[in-house]
Amino acid sequence: MEKLIIAGREFNSRLFLGTGKFSSNEWMEQSILASGTEMVTVAMKRVDMESTEDDMLKHIVHPHIQLLPNTSGVRNAEEAVFAAQMAREAFGTNWLKLEIHPDPRYLLPDSVETLKATEELVKLGFVVLPYCQADPVLCKQLEEAGAATVMPLGAPIGTNKGLQTKEFLQIIIEQAGIPVVVDAGIGAPSHAAEAMEMGASACLVNTAIAVAGNPIEMAKAFKQAVEAGRTAYEAGLGMQAIGFVAEASSPLTAFLNE
């Protein structure tokens, strides 16, 4: 499996993990390690910025993991830039998952403010990974603005409904000159495998692992699914038949006359 490269950094794993909704920090840490991930997102609002010994961070920080603070909770570009600067100071990284969703019910990203914030943050030296609508035009604009990746949603956050935006994701992947990370809505390992088979660069998963009966085993399942999907994509999937006419894999029938 080819390595994933984002902003010059190589990643062996193409599975990114979120850290919300776990029943305990211990379950979270063990799930992170079981998944093999090298990219972990953490919402700034969940971290005690005043404490240098926040218990949650102790379970996330590992030498092989790129910490990716996110701006979940901000409502516009101005708030996002402010939050990003706080995150850079607190976490010592210029990597940022940009999330702007002013509607607290559906948590859908604001496309206008996301593009505006991306332009500003890139100028300030941030490595910006924006969570966005599965809009091919917007994703191309974010790429042109300097985003390190685009992170279009598969379905609304936390719904576990899979790739509801599949047709748009296919266009985004086809047109992209930067990695495409499918984010939000992935509820089963099969969803992740499907995204990777389409050519997605990576998947970000949180809820499906965190609320599973056994998060550690589910993390392992997602690891295997992402690897299988990516390997299948790199190997070259066979074309699907048109219509419903079967085609035998062993069509020779001469032996019947022997």
Curated annotation (Swiss-Prot):
Its main location: cytoplasm. GO terms for molecular function: thiazole synthase activity. The active site is at residue 97. SUPFAM superfamilies: ThiG-like (SSF110399). GO terms for biological process: thiamine diphosphate biosynthetic process. It catalyses: [ThiS sulfur-carrier protein]-C-terminal-Gly-aminoethanethioate + 2-iminoacetate + 1-deoxy-D-xylulose 5-phosphate = [ThiS sulfur-carrier protein]-C-terminal Gly-Gly + 2-[(2R,5Z)-2-carboxy-4-methylthiazol-5(2H)-ylidene]ethyl phosphate + 2 H2O + H(+). It is found in: Cytoplasm. The keyword Cell inner membrane does not apply. Keywords: Cytoplasm, Schiff base, Thiamine biosynthesis, Transferase. GO terms for cellular component: cytoplasm. Pathway: Cofactor biosynthesis; thiamine diphosphate biosynthesis. CDD domains: ThiG. Its EC number is 2.8.1.10. It comes from the Bacteria. 1-deoxy-D-xylulose 5-phosphate binds at residues 158, 184-185, 206-207. Gene3D superfamilies: Aldolase class I. Homotetramer. Forms heterodimers with either ThiH or ThiS. Catalyzes the rearrangement of 1-deoxy-D-xylulose 5-phosphate (DXP) to produce the thiazole phosphate moiety of thiamine. Sulfur is provided by the thiocarboxylate moiety of the carrier protein ThiS. In vitro, sulfur can be provided by H(2)S. Belongs to the ThiG family. This is Thiazole synthase. The gene is thiG.
